Amino acid sequence: MTKQIKGILGEKLGMTQVWDENNRVVPVTVVKAGPNVVTQVRTNDVDGYESVQIAFGEIDPRKVNKPLKGHFAKADVTPRRHLVEIRTAAASEYTLGQEITAEAFESGVKVDVTAKSKGKGFAGVMKRHNFKGGKASHGAHRVHRMPGSIGGCATPGRVFKGMRMAGRMGNERVTTQNLTVHAVDAEKGLLLIKGAVPGPNGGLVLVRTAAKGA
């Protein structure tokens, strides 16, 4: 069953700290949320499921291909850089061209934040997968940070898929669940989210109603 999910695209500005009502320091991530526009509404009757497509970020119209130009023209909005579709049971409450701002969320609600994590480059198994590594002394010969065995020899004669090994780390889609919206600045379009959010400053983030939260 699809829940009533709210969502908004925005830009991560960075972290700071604020005081709460009990005079305790709270670390927060500041997200410049929206404004987004609704570019498509999917319904059960036509599409077999309910969702809403939102767009964010200005883009030069000359850089948009013809199919997307027609898609934006149908919604009567200017072309945008980023598009995302959110499954929600409340899709019928949205209309084409409707603007979505930070006011869609209230302080205290739980949210899931999705973004591309920071790229770390090529990393070994100790950094990438938290391996213990080899012995630091007592006969260890240049195996201190090696992964150890990666499988059998003639049987199975190959390395199984999913084997944790050294490789490119980060720069992948990550979702941090059940973060709390500490405060909303509707005038400036800011969301103050308690704790850390994936990705670098200036990165694109998607803030949605928590899938597992209360």
From Swiss-Prot:
Recorded name of the encoding gene: rplC
InterPro entries, alphabetized: Ribosomal_uL3, Ribosomal_uL3_bac/org-type, Ribosomal_uL3_CS, Transl_B-barrel_sf
Any GO CC annotation of this UniProt entry: cytosolic large ribosomal subunit
This protein's record includes keyword Mitochondrion: no
Classification via NCBIfam families: L3_bact
Subunit text: Part of the 50S ribosomal subunit. Forms a cluster with proteins L14 and L19.
GO BP: translation
Name this polypeptide is given: Large ribosomal subunit protein uL3
Organism in which the protein naturally occurs: Streptomyces coelicolor (strain ATCC BAA-471 / A3(2) / M145)
